[in-house]
Amino acid sequence: MAERPRKRPCGPGEHGQRVEWRKWKQQKKEEKKKWKDLKIMKKLERQRAQEEEAKRQEEEEEAAAQRSNQGRPYTLSVALPGSILDNAQSPELRTYLAGQIARACTIFCVDEIVVFDEEGQDTKSVEGEFRGVGKKGQACVQLARILQYLECPQYLRKAFFPKHQDLQFAGILNPLDSPHHMRQDEESEFREGVVVDRPTKAGHGSLVNCGMKKEVKIDKKLDPGLRVTVRLNQQQLPECKTYKGTVVSSQDPRTKAGLYWGYTVRLASCLSAVFAEAPFQDGYDLTIGTSERGSDVASAQLPSFRHALVVFGGLQGLEAAVDADPNLEVADPSVLFDFYVNTCLSQGSRTIRTEEAILISLAALQPGLTQVGSRPASPLSGPRM
């Protein structure tokens, strides 16, 4: 019987190679499994991130909708003659009087202040300076400049207001402390800023100084020195050298968030120009004149409106402004207004100064204006006495 050949025993090297091969295959399997698990985890993370982003966008849309409901749809304008500064006895008192008017208008959320010349002097810009009592029109210029200075946030004044004689005593003025006058670390969705003169990369927006520790990079390229309203992004990267934001209309804080965002200042050469040069397409749809000869303000039933105007007279009342206006052929100022009201019946003083009349009248009118201004304006609605 032939002997079977015996298997040659494998050497230690071959056995070692077989063991290493098994280990390598096992290792590859584990690595493949880890890679698959990692891929699944990344996919889950992407899905989670997308869900969080969708949820964040939904929350932002809900917040925006809530803000739009909280917004104030109407505007309030005040017109007064610049000649009231002529009654002040010194430059310091003239400056302080202008500050009182600015404070009164800010307290009652006035959106526009119109300074008109009741003597009919043609003054349409703030160029020039006040040269003393008796100079026609120059009091309007000084009043407008001080009003603009006070409305501007403190961190922007150096950029927009160089040294000027009209602002010589601005240091005695009380600050307005309105919502757009913010501290450096104060958090807010909106901020006022000035475009800085600094080069940026092609396709990138300009840099804006908003009074914060970092400048804000906006979405548009704008000319340096321009004052803008910026809406800051909710998500900011702490390690980034700048904040991110978007340029929006200066009306957005009022219409979308219900914030009072200061006032604009307009000069009018006469009383009729207050109406004729209105910045709104259809003008003012509610006009109110104030006088001691007017009807009781309590009896006035205000209609719904979008743009209201309240007009105050000077030392001689609105009658003097009507007489001096070459464009008006009426003697009774009440025909110019939807309502001609007396806001302080049974007054104890023979005269009420204009700065006092602003506070008294706006306090009397505010409840009615707030109530009817929040309703949508009807094209058929008209004044009701």
Curated annotation (Swiss-Prot):
InterPro entries: Alpha/beta_knot_MTases, NA-bd_OB-fold, Put_MeTrfase-C9orf114-like, tRNA_m1G_MTases_N. Residues 1-35, 47-72 are annotated as: Disordered. GO terms for biological process: cell division; maintenance of centrosome location; miRNA processing; post-transcriptional regulation of gene expression; rRNA base methylation. Coiled coil: none annotated. The keyword Cell cycle applies. Signal peptide: none annotated. Its EC number is 2.1.1.-. Its main location: cytoplasm. The keyword 4Fe-4S does not apply. Keywords: Cell cycle, Cell division, Centromere, Chromosome, Cytoplasm, Cytoskeleton, Kinetochore, Methyltransferase, Mitosis, rRNA processing, S-adenosyl-L-methionine, Transferase. Residues 15-35, 47-58 have a biased composition (Basic and acidic residues). It is found in: Cytoplasm, Cytoskeleton, Spindle; Chromosome, Centromere, Kinetochore; Cytoplasm, Cytoskeleton, Microtubule organizing center, Centrosome. Gene3D superfamilies: 3.40.1280.10, Nucleic acid-binding proteins. One of its GO terms (cellular component) is kinetochore. It catalyses: uridine in 28S rRNA + S-adenosyl-L-methionine = N(3)-methyluridine in 28S rRNA + S-adenosyl-L-homocysteine + H(+). One of its GO terms (molecular function) is rRNA (uridine-N3-)-methyltransferase activity. S-adenosyl-L-methionine binds at residues 293, 313, 342-343. It is an enzyme of class 2 (transferase). Interacts with INCA1. Belongs to the class IV-like SAM-binding methyltransferase superfamily. S-adenosyl-L-methionine-dependent methyltransferase that specifically methylates the N3 position of a uridine in 28S rRNA. Required for association of the centrosomes with the poles of the bipolar mitotic spindle during metaphase. Also involved in chromosome alignment. May promote centrosome maturation probably by recruiting A-kinase anchor protein AKAP9 to centrosomes in early mitosis. Binds specifically to miRNA MIR145 hairpin, regulates MIR145 expression at a postranscriptional level. PANTHER family: CLASS IV SAM-BINDING METHYLTRANSFERASE-RELATED, METHYLTRANSFERASE C9ORF114-RELATED. This is 28S rRNA (uridine-N(3))-methyltransferase. It comes from Mus musculus. The lineage of its organism: Eukaryota, Metazoa, Chordata, Craniata, Vertebrata. The gene is Spout1.
